[in-house]
């Protein structure tokens, strides 16, 4: 009976270790995908406010644009 318990515990530890390795590999892959690469250095998003928006803008705010790169937004 003691041998059966030890074998079961060892089998459980091996299964948990394999599962942890798989999770670590997925986490490493996700982290590698989130890091900015050399090819997306120049990628930018530009947002403009449509003229028919619900809230009217003052004359000084008309034509305001936002340029976002790498999580940093600048108003143009």
Swiss-Prot record:
Disulfide bond residue pairs: 68-73
Swiss-Prot/TrEMBL keywords: Antibiotic, Antimicrobial, Defensin, Disulfide bond, Fungicide, Signal
Residue numbers covered by the propeptide annotation in the UniProt entry: 23-64, 74-76
GO BP: any one term: antibacterial humoral response
Positions of region (Disordered): 25-54
GO cellular component: extracellular space
Post-translational modification: Forms a cyclic peptide with 1 subunit B (RTD-2) or with 1 subunit A (RTD-1). An additional intersubunit disulfide bond is formed.
Signal peptide stretch: 1-22
Tissue and organ distribution: RTD-1 is expressed in bone marrow. Detected in promyelocytes, myelocytes and mature neutrophils and monocytes.
Cross-link Cyclopeptide (Cys-Arg) (interchain with R-65 in subunit A): where in chain: 73
Positions of crosslink type Cyclopeptide (Cys-Arg) (interchain with R-65 in subunit B): 73
Cross-link (Cyclopeptide (Arg-Cys) (interchain with C-73 in subunit A)): 65
Placement of covalent cross-link Cyclopeptide (Arg-Cys) (interchain with C-73 in subunit B): 65
Low complexity compositional bias, start-end: 30-44
Alphabetical list of SMART domains matching this protein: Defensin_propep
One Pfam family, short name: Defensin_propep
Domain of life: Eukaryota
Annotated family: Belongs to the alpha-defensin family. Theta subfamily.
Functional description taken from the UniProt entry: RTD-1 and RTD-2 have similar antimicrobial activities against the Gram-positive bacteria S.aureus 502A and L.monocytogenes, the Gram-negative bacterium S.typhimurium, and the fungi C.albicans 16820 and C.neoformans 271A. RTD-2 is 2-3-fold less active than RTD-1 against E.coli ML35.
PANTHER family hit by this protein: ALPHA-DEFENSIN 1, DEMIDEFENSIN-3
UniProt subunit comment: RTD-1 is a cyclic heterodimer composed of subunits A and B; disulfide-linked. RTD-2 is a cyclic homodimer composed of two subunits B; disulfide-linked.
Note: RTD-1 is 10-fold more present in cells than RTD-2.
Official protein name in the record: Rhesus theta defensin-1/2 subunit B
Provenance organism: Macaca mulatta (Rhesus macaque)
Organism phylogeny: Eukaryota, Metazoa, Chordata, Craniata, Vertebrata
């Amino acid at each position: 009976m003691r041998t059966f318990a030890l074998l079961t515990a060892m089998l459980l530890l091996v299964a948990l270790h394999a599962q942890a390795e798989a999770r670590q590999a997925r986490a490493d892959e996700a982290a590698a995908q989130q890091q900015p690469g050399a090819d997306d250095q120049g990628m930018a998003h530009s947002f403009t406010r449509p003229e028919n928006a619900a809230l009217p803008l003052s004359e000084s705010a008309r034509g305001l644009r936002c340029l976002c790169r790498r999580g940093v937004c600048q108003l143009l």
